[in-house]
């Protein structure tokens, strides 16, 4: 079973509480999503492999550690996942970025995939799938299905807020996936929104209704 981790760093929790407020502006919401994603990135990337390499400082030669050069890919679930990309890229600027586009059918609440655009070598990369919300879990499951069909195996899912229903669905469908979140909320309401949640992350990021 992959691990499930709530990242409870004080800065993340403080920023998340501001993010949740209904009067937080689009500009501020966008900035906060970016900042929280960056802070979460430190924990999500904790297990990246290191190797020893000899370098020369202004004083002497020395053996130090650096990333092994393992290939990374950040894959946002469109559209809200886009808001988390820059924060993670600030930590791993050489990462490739793929896109999986989905929308939620408002009657069935099920996700519908309309776009998959990925690096050609996606099967060789460590992948961070990002979406601010893990609500019903349908989009996350479908996105990871798409990645696995293309040979991807090393996948982590990163979200800001999650619901127990979505977590259960994702873990049952993909028990090998590590899941990182900043909060596990109470439940979903009858419309499939997380309670207390933060509303529609996509609308709040882009100023739409």
UniProtKB/Swiss-Prot annotation:
Residues reported to bind 5-phospho-alpha-D-ribose 1-diphosphate: 79, 104, 131-139, 200
Entry EC no(s): 2.4.2.9
A Pfam family the protein falls into: UPRTase
Protein name (database record): Uracil phosphoribosyltransferase
UniProt keyword Glycosyltransferase present: yes
Activity regulation annotation text: Allosterically activated by GTP.
Top-rank taxon: Bacteria
Gene3D superfamilies the record matches: 3.40.50.2020
Gene Ontology MF terms in the entry: GTP binding; magnesium ion binding; uracil phosphoribosyltransferase activity
Biological or metabolic pathway of the protein: Pyrimidine metabolism; UMP biosynthesis via salvage pathway; UMP from uracil: step 1/1
GO biological process: one example: UMP salvage
Organism: Streptococcus mutans serotype c (strain ATCC 700610 / UA159)
Physiological role: Catalyzes the conversion of uracil and 5-phospho-alpha-D-ribose 1-diphosphate (PRPP) to UMP and diphosphate.
Record's catalysed reaction(s): UMP + diphosphate = 5-phospho-alpha-D-ribose 1-diphosphate + uracil
Cofactor(s) needed: Mg(2+)
Cofactor info, note text: Binds 1 Mg(2+) ion per subunit. The magnesium is bound as Mg-PRPP.
Family, per entry: Belongs to the UPRTase family.
Residues that, per the record, bind uracil: 194, 199-201
Entry keyword set: Allosteric enzyme, Glycosyltransferase, GTP-binding, Magnesium, Nucleotide-binding, Transferase
């Amino acid at each position: 079973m992959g691990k499930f981790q709530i990242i409870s760093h004080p800065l993340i929790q403080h920023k998340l509480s501001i993010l949740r407020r209904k009067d937080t502006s689009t500009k501020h919401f966008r900035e906060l999503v970016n900042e929280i994603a960056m802070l979460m990135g430190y924990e999500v990337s904790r297990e990246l492999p290191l190797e020893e390499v000899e370098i020369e400082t202004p004083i002497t030669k020395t053996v130090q550690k650096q990333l092994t050069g393992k290939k990374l890919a950040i894959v946002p679930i469109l559209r809200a996942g886009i808001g988390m990309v820059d924060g993670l890229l600030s930590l791993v600027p050489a990462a490739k970025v793929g896109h999986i586009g989905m929308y939620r059918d408002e009657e069935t609440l099920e996700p519908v995939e309309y776009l998959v655009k990925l690096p050609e070598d996606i099967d060789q990369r460590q992948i961070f799938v990002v979406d601010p919300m893990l609500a019903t879990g349908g989009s996350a499951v479908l996105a990871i299905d798409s990645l696995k069909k293309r040979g991807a195996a090393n996948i982590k899912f990163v979200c800001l807020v999650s619901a127990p229903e979505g977590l259960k669905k994702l873990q049952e469908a993909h028990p090998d996936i590590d899941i990182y979140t900043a909060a596990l909320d109470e439940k979903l309401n009858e419309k499939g929104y997380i309670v207390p949640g933060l509303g529609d992350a996509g609308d709040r990021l882009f100023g739409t209704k």
